[in-house]
């Protein structure tokens, strides 16, 4: 089982704010709704929409991702959509930020976060001891199991 979380430059206090928002999204059912819009029997039935009265006065946060891992993040036309995009938007809605998503090679996400080019990374990213040496992760927001299917 893999644990997915968002990554931040070490010591970035924004991670704690994200953890608080993630806990609220888990508690109020928003996280489950976002997941069910992409995985399971209700795909497409629960699209996330930002509340009309969202205050975005805290500025813009840039999310580094690799939009090639459907349903976590992928392109629909020129838009980057998916579970991570929706969760990140929901968090930014709670915290008062505009969200900007930057698509890049997966292997450059950590460097982008550490250099300040991006505020955080979200890309179906598995928490590993090696990655924890260079970035701080939020609390886990999803677990995934990878399997191989072979023909009998």
Give short role names for the model-derived ranges.
Residues 33, 43-60:
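Short, low-complexity disordered leader/linker segments with a strong preference
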Residues 28, 33, 58-125, 133:
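Extracytoplasmic small-molecule ligand-binding "clamshell" domains
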Residues 1-9, 44-50, 129-144:
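Ligand-binding "clamshell"
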Residues 2-3, 58-60, 69, 143-145:
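A structure-centric signal for secondary-structure junctions around beta-strands
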Residues 11-12, 97, 126, 139-152:
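A conserved helix-loop-strand patch within extracytoplasmic ligand-binding domains
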Residues 7, 61-65, 149:
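Short, well-ordered beta-strand segments
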Residues 10, 22, 65-67, 103-106, ...:
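A mature extracytoplasmic/lumenal domain signature
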Residues 2-44, 85-94, 150-152:
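Extended ligand-binding regions for polar small-molecule ligands
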